[in-house]
């Protein structure tokens, strides 16, 4: 699979040791694989967690999951440390990196969204590896993992990785975690089996995804939410175990690894993907059955088909 644009997301659990400190060997192995993939002609965008964990280790403090400002302070201390290791490891392969910190507002505002797209595209043209993380210092959407009204949270960067894939027209999203993929039930329970391919997000799939990861905030549930967005956007997504040797290279070589979420339908145009998943919801329009059918056919919505409006929003 050469010449492809791939978004690789690695979660906190894959980057830290059992004591919560950064696992530099795991980071180095991931960088080695990305470097090889790039030299084979692929373009890689890395979406990484781990800033808070790095900050906790640097400041020599105990984790306090209920103190939001504490987590933000740790992220501020840890982000530069996280990047310094990535820069060092990629430099060994002759590759340069660029830090990109984003918030939900950056992707929900159309102008900021387009600027982000342009910068990422230019970095890739320059042969630079964009390394993306949510800006935990100014945004709490990620560190408070709940659905906020009708907006989608980044949820430990799972959702963010797919939004970035949409923004850059990526060919594939790979989410690396601490399990082999999606199981029929918790992999710690007897009788659990790996689900190799998912073609539709069913209630059974959602039930199989219940539970959270030890260090991360998202867990499998938000990975399924991310996968559903990718599938609807026409982008395949794979969940795989970061601890598997050469996991990323095997995926790019076409080997079946982890759980593949197949896209369905045609690939959405960029503007429709942004409207569907990037723009924050400001209100609702209730339409009649005729208008619904017209919209599903791709036709325009006429005023006669509107039955009700709620919320405050502007044209466009």
Say what each PLM segment does.
Residues 1-96, 100-315:
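C-terminal catalytic "cap/lid" subdomain
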């Amino acid at each position: 699979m050469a010449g492809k644009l791939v978004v690789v997301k690695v979660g906190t659990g894959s980057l830290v040791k059992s004591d919560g400190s950064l696992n530099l060997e795991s980071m180095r192995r991931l960088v080695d694989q990305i470097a090889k993939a790039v030299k084979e002609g692929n373009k890689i965008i890395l979406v990484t967690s781990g800033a808070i964990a790095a900050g906790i280790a640097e400041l020599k403090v105990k984790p306090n999951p209920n103190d939001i400002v504490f987590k933000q302070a740790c992220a501020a201390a840890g982000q530069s440390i996280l990047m310094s290791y990535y820069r060092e490891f990629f430099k060994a392969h002759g590759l340069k990196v660029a830090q990109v910190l984003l918030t939900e507002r950056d992707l929900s505002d159309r102008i900021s969204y387009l600027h982000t797209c342009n910068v990422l595209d230019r970095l890739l043209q320059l042969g630079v590896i964009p390394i993306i993380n949510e800006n935990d210092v100014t945004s709490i959407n990620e560190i408070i993992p709940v659905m906020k009204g009708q907006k989608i949270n980044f949820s430990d960067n799972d959702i963010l990785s797919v939004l970035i894939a949409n923004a850059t027209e990526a060919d594939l999203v790979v989410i690396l975690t601490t399990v082999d993929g999606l199981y029929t039930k918790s992999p710690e329970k007897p009788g659990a089996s790996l689900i190799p391919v998912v073609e539709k997000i069913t209630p059974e799939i959602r039930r199989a995804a219940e539970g959270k990861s030890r260090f991360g905030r998202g867990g499998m549930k938000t990975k399924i939410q991310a996968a559903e967005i990718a599938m609807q956007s026409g982008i395949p997504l794979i969940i795989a175990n970061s601890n598997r040797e050469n996991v990323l290279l095997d995926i790019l070589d076409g080997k079946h690894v982890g759980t593949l979420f197949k896209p369905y339908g045609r690939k959405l145009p960029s503007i429709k993907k942004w409207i569907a998943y990037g723009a924050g919801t400001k209100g609702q329009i209730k339409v009649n059955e005729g208008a619904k059918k017209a919209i599903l056919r791709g036709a325009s919505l006429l005023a006669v088909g509107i039955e009700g409006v709620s919320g405050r929003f502007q044209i466009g």
